[in-house]
From Swiss-Prot:
Function according to Swiss-Prot or TrEMBL: Mitochondrial GTPase that catalyzes the GTP-dependent ribosomal translocation step during translation elongation. During this step, the ribosome changes from the pre-translocational (PRE) to the post-translocational (POST) state as the newly formed A-site-bound peptidyl-tRNA and P-site-bound deacylated tRNA move to the P and E sites, respectively. Catalyzes the coordinated movement of the two tRNA molecules, the mRNA and conformational changes in the ribosome.
GO cellular component terms, semicolon-separated: mitochondrion
Main subcellular localisation: mitochondrion
Disulfide bonds: none
Pathway(s) per entry: Protein biosynthesis; polypeptide chain elongation
Organism: Chaetomium globosum (strain ATCC 6205 / CBS 148.51 / DSM 1962 / NBRC 6347 / NRRL 1970) (Soil fungus)
Protein name: Elongation factor G, mitochondrial
């Protein structure tokens, strides 16, 4: 206590004779005040004045340094999980246990947004239901963008919050949901990616007719990437051809995650009226306007009793494979109670070993409420999930974040959005409390920012709040940052890993039709790039054209349309361009001498070595030096590496990126006055370009995993279409429709939607997802290279 008193006293007094002492004391007091109860510190400050005056400053400096060390140790002790748990009030523990951060994700048109609308209605968040393509023209609440309502698709993920009152054994508990509705189209996959990065659980929606589809597999991959537990909801049970058990089989076989139904349907297709709960063996139906009332009966329809017993046994057997407690009971031939089954499902789901499958029809207002109960029962609260940060003071050692309000603040900015009131930054609070007016530090650049306003989002509406606790999701105004930035209150040297951002696969040139729109065009482009990491822009040095890149035709079309609507900028766009890559297939040696004299100091550099395929990583490049004897000094070798990187940005064949190349420098020569970093950088670039043709330089084209769904009667027409475009990988034929999966060159898919509409009378649909790069056919490569050389010649002749 005496050293803290010393520090406090010195901080209060005018310690002019020892600036070092004052500095230590100030730090000690600040640390003590932020990590200890305030009263003892104030007491120490008053008492310490009796011990120290200006004449004691040198002694105080030593005492203050000891005080700083002690205060830091005290602060560290207060930040341990045990100390934080001890300070947690029963109210905070209760609040945390009732929070569910969930997302709704699925294939296109599986009913994600319709499910979200029912969740909002049944939780009382909205007073009326508006359909995605409803006749009232209002559109779904979660599709707030005009383009979304016109096209009937979700383009941006939308966040909201709601309270769900769950009744169990006559006791009502209120759960708090933070809900994010995500797009289904692959072009907007970054929206799903960043949602999964910050969510604790998800509802994976499947179509009862189609089951697991192409985008379902993509969503599954994203959930696994971020270790997100999920429950599965088989939607559209009232459709003709619905088969929930086929969907369960497909989850097991295609997604490779153990799954079992926890419900079976009462009635099928148009006769679907509810579900049988296999855990409690009871029937659940919906009554009243929009299915607002849930009617539970302990009497199961007679014709379903045998099926219910069979599916319940299958559920227990599947749980025995993934849960030790149920496995032990199964071996002892004991029947688990409903409580034991629910506990096992929760353990296995949170442990990423299992997904329970529920079923219903959101559009028909049936069996959505039991799915909400399942979210409460089986998906984790923020305290059940291991969210990790990287401690930058310990070489980015992983450290677990704890969702306690009393700990230092750590949050992740996962989405940026332009708003009439300024930039809106969505933040997931992992640890600590975020308060209005609080100062935070951006871990990426150590910039200090103030939080002037905190809101909770309800699609495009907002509600102001003064503070947000640990485990919650909110949005803030007035914070300049990038998507994926970590924020702390300055007491912890933590950063967090960002989300995965896929490479763009398509580009096109764009320019405003009117020169007067240049400022608005530039403003829009900066905003779009800030909001969407998959939307990129660059200016081609040779053509001086502005090139935008994205995930597909629809992705870029949407941004061109938003330019017109939101910024009143009409644009001219060029033909879509494929993002080709260049590579090499064999080893080639080089010995290149750069020797230029222009009156003054010249350029001299010689580099010797070879280039070869990068066998370690076909998607990346590698530079290596094996120079002996100091023929090239180290300072120039670094310039050689930089030159190789720059040469790979724009390949010799088409001007596209080079991948899969390994360059080795073994020897070289320098000149006393004419050698420089610039000379060796340029010599390396020229050596690489000269050796590229000898190394079997080739063009790689992107292959797309293409999924086509259409009525079975058009199967022959689509086979003819796809035989011209790519190799067919798989075909699934159902009662009324079929699905074809093929690998196609992106170049061959331009305008495919028009051909598909003609071949299927407008009844077919398709989606594309980048698969991998593969060598382009020789005739295409020859054509592309000739076209590129012709363009270069035309530019040189201008």
């Amino acid at each position: 206590m005496r050293v803290i008193r010393a520090a406090a006293a010195l901080n209060s007094s005018c310690a002019a004779s020892s600036r070092q002492g004052a500095r230590y004391a100030s730090l000690a007091c600040r640390t003590a005040l932020t990590s200890s109860p305030l009263a003892p510190c104030y007491s120490a400050r008053l008492s310490g004045l009796r011990y120290f005056t200006k004449t004691h400053a040198p002694r105080a400096a030593s005492a203050a340094e000891a005080a700083l060390k002690q205060a830091k140790e005290l602060a560290a002790a207060n930040m341990t999980p045990e100390a934080a748990a001890a300070r947690m009030t029963p109210e905070e523990a209760k609040r945390l246990s009732m929070v569910r951060n969930i997302g709704i994700a699925a294939h296109i048109d599986s009913g994600k947004t319709t499910v979200s609308e029912r969740i909002l209605f049944y939780t009382g968040r909205t007073k009326a239901i508006h359909e995605v393509r409803g006749r009232d023209g209002v559109g779904a609440k979660m599709d707030s963008m005009e383009l979304e309502r016109e096209r009937g698709i979700t383009i941006q993920s939308a966040a909201t919050f709601a309270d769900w009152k769950k009744v169990e054994n006559g006791v009502e508990e209120t759960y708090h949901f933070n809900l994010i509705d995500t797009p289904g189209h692959i072009d907007f996959t970054i929206e799903v990616e960043r949602a999964m990065r910050v969510l604790d659980g998800a509802v994976m929606v499947l179509c009862a007719v189609s089951g697991v589809q192409s985008q379902t597999i993509t969503v599954d991959r994203q959930m696994k990437r971020y270790n997100v537990p999920r429950i599965s909801f088989v939607n559209k049970m009232d459709r003709m051809g619905s088969n929930p058990f086929k969907a369960v089989e497909m989850i097991n076989s295609k997604l490779k995650i153990p799954a079992a139904a926890v419900q079976i349907p009462i009635g099928s297709e148009k006769e679907f009226e509810g579900v049988v709960d296999l855990i409690h063996m009871r029937a659940i139906r919906n009554d009243g306007l929009r299915g607002i009332n849930v009617r539970v009966s302990n009497t199961i329809p007679e014709n379903l009793k045998e099926l219910a017993e069979q599916k319940r046994q299958e559920l227990i057997e599947k749980l025995a494979d993934v849960d030790d407690e149920i496995a032990e009971m199964f071996l002892e031939e004991k029947t688990p109670t409903p409580e034991q089954i629910k506990a096992a499902i929760r353990r296995a789901t949170i442990g990423l070993k299992f997904t329970p499958v529920l079923m219903g029809s959101a559009l028909a207002d049936k069996s959505v409420q039991p799915m909400l109960d399942a979210v409460c029962d089986y998906l984790p609260n923020p305290g059940n999930v291991d969210n990790m940060a990287l401690d930058r003071s310990k070489k980015e050692e992983p450290v677990k974040l704890l969702p306690y309000d009393s700990l230092p603040f750590v949050g992740l900015a996962f989405k940026l959005e332009e708003n009439p009131y300024g930039q809106l930054t969505y933040i997931r609070v992992y640890q600590g409390t975020l308060k209005k007016g609080q100062y935070l530090f951006n871990a990426r650049n150590d910039k200090k920012v103030r939080i002037p306003r905190i809101v909770r989002m309800h699609s495009n509406e907002m509600e102001d709040v003064n503070e947000i606790g640990a485990g919650e999701i909110c949005a803030v105004f007035g914070v300049e940052c990038a998507s994926g930035d970590t924020f702390t209150d300055g007491r912890l040297p933590y950063g967090m890993s960002s989300m995965f951002v896929p490479d763009s696969v398509m580009s096109l040139s764009i320019k405003p039709k009117r020169s007067s729109d240049a400022d608005a065009f530039s403003k829009a482009m900066n905003r779009f790039m800030r909001e969407d990491p998959t939307f990129r822009l660059h200016v081609d040095e040779e053509s001086e054209e502005t090139i935008i890149s994205g995930m597909g035709e629809l992705h870029l079309d949407i941004y061109v349309e938003r330019l017109r609507r939101e910024y009143k900028v009409d644009c001219e766009t060029g033909k879509p361009r494929v993002a080709y890559r260049e590579t090499i297939s064999k080893r080639a040696e080089y010995d290149f001498l750069l020797k230029r004299q222009s009156g003054g100091p010249g350029d001299y550099a010689r580099v010797v070595g070879w280039i070869e395929p990068n066998v370690e990583n076909a998607e990346g490049n590698k530079f290596e030096t094996k120079v002996v004897g100091g023929n090239i000094p180290d300072k120039y070798l670094a310039a050689c590496g930089k030159g190789f990187e720059e040469a790979c940005i724009k390949g010799p064949l088409l001007g596209h990126k080079v991948i899969g190349a390994h360059m080795v420098v073994t020897d070289g020569a320098t000149h006393v006055t004419d050698s420089s970093d610039y000379a060796f950088n340029l010599a390396t670039q020229m050596a690489f370009r000269k050796a590229f043709p000898d190394a079997g330089g080739a063009v790689l084209e992107p292959l797309m995993k293409t999924t086509i769904t259409a009525p079975a009667e058009f199967q022959g027409n689509i086979l003819m279409l796809m035989n011209k475009r790519g190799s067919i990988v798989d075909t699934e034929v159902g009662a009324d429709e079929f699905t074809m999966i093929a690998e196609c060159s992106l170049n061959a898919m331009f305008g495919f939607s028009t051909h598909l509409r003609a071949a299927t009378q407008g009844k077919g649909e398709f989606s594309m997802e980048f698969s991998h790069y593969a060598p382009a056919p020789p005739h295409l490569q020859k054509e592309l290279v000739a076209q590129y050389e012709k363009e270069l010649e035309a530019k040189r002749s201008k």
